[in-house]
Amino acid sequence: MTKSSFLKSVLPLANKIHTSYGSQFEKNPKVINQILDKLNLESYYKSESLQILDIYAGPLIQSVILNERLKPKKHVLLEDRLKFVELYQATLKDHPSMVNYNKNPYKWETFLEMTNEDRVLTPSMQKRDHIHNEFLIAANLTNKKGEQLYVQYLQCIANQNWMQRFGLVKMLVWIPQQTARKLFAPFSNKDRNRLTLLSELATNTKLVATSENSVKKFLPDCIEKFDPVIIPSDNKSPDDLSLVEINPRDHSIDLDHWDFVTQKLMILKSKPVEEMIEILGHGARDWFISRLDPVLLKKKPYELTYLEIDEIAKVFALWPFKPSLLVDFYDENED
């Protein structure tokens, strides 16, 4: 695909920005187009009412290419880092479909203000029996807060709130390979944790692309299954970058109890459930041992499926002496 005049005008300005604010960005148009060819988003997002939300949009190159391929009615760049905002101010004035919402993407209220008060983004509501075909989210979560935010986004998918209140909204998210590796850790692999289980519960997630230097960090079965685009390790591309495609799915699990049990069990994930069940609360052993399948009790938490966790959570929900549920959220004031 040839470079448009808009992209040609953006590239030199974007490449002059020498800070990434702790994030990593793929800025090679050839690689970005190769990834978008694999995703084939054009075959699904055909509506003239399409809206795109770009979270931590950064140096604009991917955003321009995505915009020109999908031609959305509105493309909101949620970004408040100074050098990137200055880039948008210098380049977007002749491209009305692309607007910068200059507020902090890390703050929950930013998204409420964007959709409810300022109405910069106004997605349609769609039923939860298909992937939303008029709303797409892209995000770059490669900074130090990235994995924490990724977990929060998964919770929002599972809880059907935040941007996911509009329906099952596909997300394209850049993350470090360390986070991606956890997402695709198979049963009985010690990389499995709460992130893995939450992803399996609420989404169908695919590995779309990963850096050449990161390939060996994934199990061969994962690479064979997804056949990701391999980003070459050269001076044009970061060496620790993975892109995942998150396709939310509906579920009927009681997430409060499930999440509490998952968090607790993963603290001692290398011990059999029957040996560490007291971590759910004082007296748990007396309640759970006779009510759970003996086969399940002998498993270690990293060997469990999200449905097996749900079996434990259902017994937990009936426990008269269960502790109060404490839900962890990210700290908006964290540095």
UniProtKB/Swiss-Prot annotation:
Q: Which Pfam families match?
A: RrnaAD (PF00398)
Q: Which UniProt keywords apply?
A: DNA-binding, Methyltransferase, Mitochondrion, RNA-binding, S-adenosyl-L-methionine, Transcription, Transcription regulation, Transferase
The enzyme class is transferase
| Residues involved in S-adenosyl-L-methionine binding | E79
Q: Which GO terms describe its molecular function?
A: DNA binding; methyltransferase activity; mitochondrial transcription factor activity; RNA binding
Cell compartment(s), UniProt: Mitochondrion
GO CC annotation, single: mitochondrial DNA-directed RNA polymerase complex
Briefly state the protein's biological role. Mitochondrial transcription factor that confers selective promoter recognition on the core subunit of the yeast mitochondrial RNA polymerase. Interacts with DNA in a non-specific manner.
User: Which PANTHER family does its entry note?
Assistant: DIMETHYLADENOSINE TRANSFERASE, DIMETHYLADENOSINE TRANSFERASE 1, MITOCHONDRIAL
Hey, which family's this protein in? Belongs to the class I-like SAM-binding methyltransferase superfamily. rRNA adenine N(6)-methyltransferase family.
Q: Can you say what this protein is called? A: Mitochondrial transcription factor 1
Source organism: Kluyveromyces lactis (strain ATCC 8585 / CBS 2359 / DSM 70799 / NBRC 1267 / NRRL Y-1140 / WM37) (Yeast)
Q: Gene encoding this chain? A: MTF1
